[in-house]
Regions:
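N-terminal polybasic phosphate/anion-binding patch
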Residues: 1
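C-terminal helical cap(s) of enzyme catalytic domains, especially alpha/beta-barrels
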Residues: 4-10, 52-54, 136, 147-171
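Conserved anion-binding
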Residues: 8-123, 131
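Long, hydrophilic "mature protein body" segments
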Residues: 15, 25-27, 39-42, 134-139, ...
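Residue-level signal for alpha-helix termini/capping positions
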Residues: 33, 59, 137-140, 170
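Glycine-rich phosphate-binding active-site loops on the catalytic face of alpha/beta enzymes
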Residues: 41-47, 96-102, 139-162
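A C-terminal functional module that forms or caps the active site or interfaces directly
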Residues: 123-138, 151
Length: 171
Protein backbone atom coordinates (compact mmCIF):
# COMPACT_ATOMS: atom_id res chain seq x y z
CA UNK A 1 0.00 0.00 0.00
CA UNK A 2 1.33 3.43 -0.85
CA UNK A 3 1.27 6.30 1.65
CA UNK A 4 -1.32 8.00 -0.54
CA UNK A 5 -3.59 4.92 -0.45
CA UNK A 6 -3.25 4.78 3.33
CA UNK A 7 -4.08 8.48 3.64
CA UNK A 8 -7.25 7.97 1.57
CA UNK A 9 -8.62 5.32 3.94
CA UNK A 10 -11.27 6.56 6.33
CA UNK A 11 -9.83 5.52 9.66
CA UNK A 12 -13.01 6.23 11.63
CA UNK A 13 -12.31 5.03 15.16
CA UNK A 14 -9.24 3.06 14.12
CA UNK A 15 -5.73 4.47 14.30
CA UNK A 16 -3.44 4.35 11.28
CA UNK A 17 -0.17 2.76 12.40
CA UNK A 18 2.87 2.56 10.14
CA UNK A 19 5.39 -0.16 10.97
CA UNK A 20 9.00 0.71 10.14
CA UNK A 21 12.11 -1.46 10.31
CA UNK A 22 14.39 1.12 8.68
CA UNK A 23 16.64 3.66 10.38
CA UNK A 24 16.04 6.14 7.52
CA UNK A 25 14.60 9.10 9.42
CA UNK A 26 13.67 11.09 6.30
CA UNK A 27 11.75 8.11 4.85
CA UNK A 28 9.87 7.57 8.12
CA UNK A 29 9.00 11.28 8.46
CA UNK A 30 7.87 11.62 4.83
CA UNK A 31 5.82 8.43 4.93
CA UNK A 32 4.19 9.34 8.25
CA UNK A 33 3.09 12.69 6.87
CA UNK A 34 1.99 11.44 3.43
CA UNK A 35 0.01 8.52 4.91
CA UNK A 36 -1.42 10.67 7.72
CA UNK A 37 -0.29 8.12 10.27
CA UNK A 38 -1.60 8.40 13.81
CA UNK A 39 1.20 6.22 15.24
CA UNK A 40 4.67 5.24 14.06
CA UNK A 41 5.87 1.83 15.21
CA UNK A 42 9.65 1.51 15.31
CA UNK A 43 9.93 -2.24 14.79
CA UNK A 44 13.63 -2.51 14.10
CA UNK A 45 16.89 -1.65 15.76
CA UNK A 46 16.53 2.09 15.20
CA UNK A 47 19.16 4.10 17.00
CA UNK A 48 18.45 6.42 19.90
CA UNK A 49 19.42 9.29 17.56
CA UNK A 50 16.72 8.22 15.11
CA UNK A 51 14.08 7.86 17.83
CA UNK A 52 15.02 11.19 19.42
CA UNK A 53 14.75 13.05 16.12
CA UNK A 54 11.44 11.40 15.24
CA UNK A 55 10.06 12.28 18.66
CA UNK A 56 10.97 15.93 18.04
CA UNK A 57 9.64 16.10 14.48
CA UNK A 58 6.58 13.84 14.76
CA UNK A 59 5.87 13.90 18.50
CA UNK A 60 6.95 11.34 21.08
CA UNK A 61 3.32 10.49 21.87
CA UNK A 62 2.94 9.10 18.33
CA UNK A 63 5.91 6.72 18.59
CA UNK A 64 5.62 3.06 19.56
CA UNK A 65 8.99 1.51 20.38
CA UNK A 66 9.20 -2.27 19.94
CA UNK A 67 11.37 -4.23 22.33
CA UNK A 68 11.95 -7.98 22.58
CA UNK A 69 12.08 -9.05 26.27
CA UNK A 70 13.92 -12.27 25.37
CA UNK A 71 16.97 -10.14 24.54
CA UNK A 72 17.30 -9.18 28.21
CA UNK A 73 18.59 -11.39 31.01
CA UNK A 74 15.93 -10.21 33.45
CA UNK A 75 13.12 -7.75 34.05
CA UNK A 76 15.47 -5.13 35.51
CA UNK A 77 17.51 -5.00 32.29
CA UNK A 78 14.34 -4.62 30.20
CA UNK A 79 13.10 -1.84 32.50
CA UNK A 80 16.47 -0.06 32.23
CA UNK A 81 16.18 -0.04 28.42
CA UNK A 82 12.58 1.15 28.62
CA UNK A 83 13.63 4.00 30.91
CA UNK A 84 16.35 5.06 28.42
CA UNK A 85 13.76 5.19 25.62
CA UNK A 86 10.91 6.73 27.64
CA UNK A 87 11.56 10.35 26.67
CA UNK A 88 11.32 9.58 22.95
CA UNK A 89 8.29 7.29 22.87
CA UNK A 90 4.67 7.36 23.90
CA UNK A 91 4.25 3.61 24.19
CA UNK A 92 6.14 0.34 24.06
CA UNK A 93 5.23 -2.86 22.28
CA UNK A 94 6.80 -5.99 23.75
CA UNK A 95 7.08 -8.79 21.20
CA UNK A 96 8.15 -12.43 21.28
CA UNK A 97 11.44 -13.66 19.91
CA UNK A 98 14.65 -11.75 19.42
CA UNK A 99 13.65 -9.56 16.45
CA UNK A 100 10.99 -9.07 13.81
CA UNK A 101 7.42 -10.11 14.36
CA UNK A 102 4.49 -12.02 12.95
CA UNK A 103 6.11 -15.38 13.68
CA UNK A 104 3.25 -16.67 15.81
CA UNK A 105 5.71 -17.32 18.62
CA UNK A 106 4.27 -16.59 22.07
CA UNK A 107 6.01 -14.38 24.55
CA UNK A 108 6.57 -15.78 28.03
CA UNK A 109 3.98 -13.50 29.64
CA UNK A 110 4.76 -14.73 33.16
CA UNK A 111 8.24 -13.30 32.59
CA UNK A 112 6.66 -9.83 32.38
CA UNK A 113 4.71 -10.11 35.63
CA UNK A 114 5.55 -7.12 37.82
CA UNK A 115 6.99 -5.06 34.95
CA UNK A 116 7.42 -1.44 36.05
CA UNK A 117 7.24 0.32 32.68
CA UNK A 118 7.70 4.11 32.39
CA UNK A 119 5.10 4.28 29.59
CA UNK A 120 2.01 2.26 28.63
CA UNK A 121 2.85 -0.98 26.85
CA UNK A 122 1.23 -3.43 24.48
CA UNK A 123 1.81 -7.17 24.34
CA UNK A 124 2.39 -8.92 21.02
CA UNK A 125 3.52 -12.37 20.06
CA UNK A 126 1.37 -15.37 19.21
CA UNK A 127 -1.86 -13.96 20.61
CA UNK A 128 -5.01 -15.74 19.49
CA UNK A 129 -8.67 -15.65 20.52
CA UNK A 130 -7.96 -18.92 22.34
CA UNK A 131 -5.06 -17.69 24.51
CA UNK A 132 -5.40 -13.92 24.86
CA UNK A 133 -7.41 -13.79 28.09
CA UNK A 134 -5.03 -16.09 29.97
CA UNK A 135 -1.96 -14.35 28.57
CA UNK A 136 -3.17 -10.87 29.47
CA UNK A 137 -4.13 -11.99 32.98
CA UNK A 138 -0.56 -13.20 33.52
CA UNK A 139 1.15 -9.86 32.82
CA UNK A 140 -1.52 -7.11 32.61
CA UNK A 141 -0.42 -5.06 29.58
CA UNK A 142 -2.19 -1.84 28.60
CA UNK A 143 -3.34 -3.49 25.37
CA UNK A 144 -2.58 -6.19 22.85
CA UNK A 145 -1.40 -6.41 19.26
CA UNK A 146 -2.86 -9.35 17.36
CA UNK A 147 -1.15 -10.35 14.14
CA UNK A 148 -0.49 -13.87 12.91
CA UNK A 149 -2.89 -15.31 15.51
CA UNK A 150 -5.77 -13.87 13.48
CA UNK A 151 -4.58 -15.18 10.12
CA UNK A 152 -5.95 -18.11 8.14
CA UNK A 153 -2.66 -18.19 6.21
CA UNK A 154 0.45 -15.98 6.32
CA UNK A 155 -0.51 -12.40 5.53
CA UNK A 156 -4.27 -13.05 5.30
CA UNK A 157 -6.50 -12.09 8.21
CA UNK A 158 -9.42 -14.43 8.93
CA UNK A 159 -12.62 -12.40 9.48
CA UNK A 160 -14.10 -14.97 11.88
CA UNK A 161 -10.94 -14.96 14.02
CA UNK A 162 -10.94 -11.16 13.99
CA UNK A 163 -14.57 -11.12 15.19
CA UNK A 164 -13.71 -13.62 17.95
CA UNK A 165 -10.69 -11.70 19.28
CA UNK A 166 -12.33 -8.87 21.23
CA UNK A 167 -15.01 -10.98 22.96
CA UNK A 168 -12.29 -13.49 23.88
CA UNK A 169 -10.20 -10.71 25.40
CA UNK A 170 -13.14 -9.41 27.41
CA UNK A 171 -14.01 -12.97 28.50
Amino acid sequence: MTPEQAAALDSGDMLRVGVFVTDDMRFIEETARAARLDRIQLHGDQSMTCADRLSRTLGAERLIRVLWPERYPDLAALEETMNRHAASTGMFLLDAGMSGGGSGKRIGSERLRGLNAPRPWLLAGGLTPENVKETVAACVPGGVDFNSGLESEPGRKDPSRMRAALPALRG
